[in-house]
Every structure is written in C-alpha cells, then in structure tokens.
Amino acid sequence: MEGRAWKFGDDVDTDAVIPGRYLIFNTPGELAKYTFEGVRPDFAKKVHENDIVVAGSNFGCGSSREHAPLALKGSKVSCVIAKSFARIFFRNAINIGVPVLECPNTDRIDDGDELEVDLSTGDIQNITKGETYQATPLPDFVREIVDEGGLIEYARKLVSER
C-alpha cells in the first residue's frame, strides 16, 4: 500500500479521532466526515484513499469505542502506523479491518511524506526521504482478518467455506 502520511503526536485518544458528539452515527462513511475534526479540521476534506495515519506512542488511548477505527475505515486510510497503540484500540482496529503497525521510527516520518507499506513484512519505505523502517509485521491470521474487512467478514468467510 502506498499513500501520504498524516502525522500526529503521542497519546492521540479516541475523542481526537472522532469527537464524542458524533457517536450518534455508526457507519464508517458518516463518521469519516468528522474524523480528527478537533485536531486536524482539514483532515476529512483533504485525506485521500490509501493515505496513512502516523503517530507516536499510545495511539487510540481513552474510551474503548469502535467509532474511532470505524471513522478511520470510512476515511479510507490504508493503515495506521504508531510507536505503540492502546490495546483495546489495536484489537478494535483489527476487528473493524483497519491495519495497524507498531514502528519505533515514526519520529523519522513527517507530515506529507510518501510511504509504501508492506503489511506482510512490516517494511515501511519512506519514498520522500529514501529511508526504510521496520515495523512489527502483523501475524498471518491477523492479516487475513484485515484482508477480509474485519472479524465479522472473516467469520462469515470461514462459515461459508464449511
């Protein structure tokens, strides 16, 4: 996957991803209109399909709502790369079908850098800077869940194959 980096700092909580007043919505497309509204008001209008959210430590902390990864899925970002994730956000993102990668080098990535990401190897190419970073690759079964669009879709596939 290849896209432009949208850079955020440490401790980006789920309220920053999708403000609480929009929790009345529950579809990815509707939530996408308000993604990062309080911290990057231009995000929803300027994000492009396959762009990549990059952050520091503890991304997705705070409330354990599924709305945050749903909003990111609706925004059509290809993945989220961070130094670390709040555990429940990490699980929710996988269950929703949003790839998440932990990488210790997110400080080297700047807003607007063009990145190429290989989920199977964890390789991140910063095309803008000519650098390569190593993220922790997702295990095969987790990639299968993400590739199917989330846990529910993955379970449906398993049932239909029986």
Swiss-Prot record:
Which Gene Ontology terms cover its molecular function? Answer: 3-isopropylmalate dehydratase activity
- Enzyme class, spelled out: lyase
User: Which reaction(s) does its UniProt entry say it catalyses?
Assistant: (2R,3S)-3-isopropylmalate = (2S)-2-isopropylmalate
EC number(s) on file:
4.2.1.33
Q: Looking at the record's lineage, which domain of life comes first?
A: Archaea
Q: Which InterPro entries match?
A: Aconitase/3IPM_dehydase_swvl, AconitaseA/IPMdHydase_ssu_swvl, IPMI_Swivel, LeuD, LeuD_type2/HacB/DmdB
GO terms of biological process kind: L-leucine biosynthetic process
Which biological pathway? Amino-acid biosynthesis; L-leucine biosynthesis; L-leucine from 3-methyl-2-oxobutanoate: step 2/4
Keyword annotations from UniProtKB, A to Z: Amino-acid biosynthesis, Branched-chain amino acid biosynthesis, Leucine biosynthesis, Lyase
Task: Name the NCBIfam families for this protein.
Answer: LEUD_arch
Task: Tell me the function of this protein.
Answer: Catalyzes the isomerization between 2-isopropylmalate and 3-isopropylmalate, via the formation of 2-isopropylmaleate.
* Subunit-level organization: Heterodimer of LeuC and LeuD.
Name listed for the protein in its UniProt record: 3-isopropylmalate dehydratase small subunit
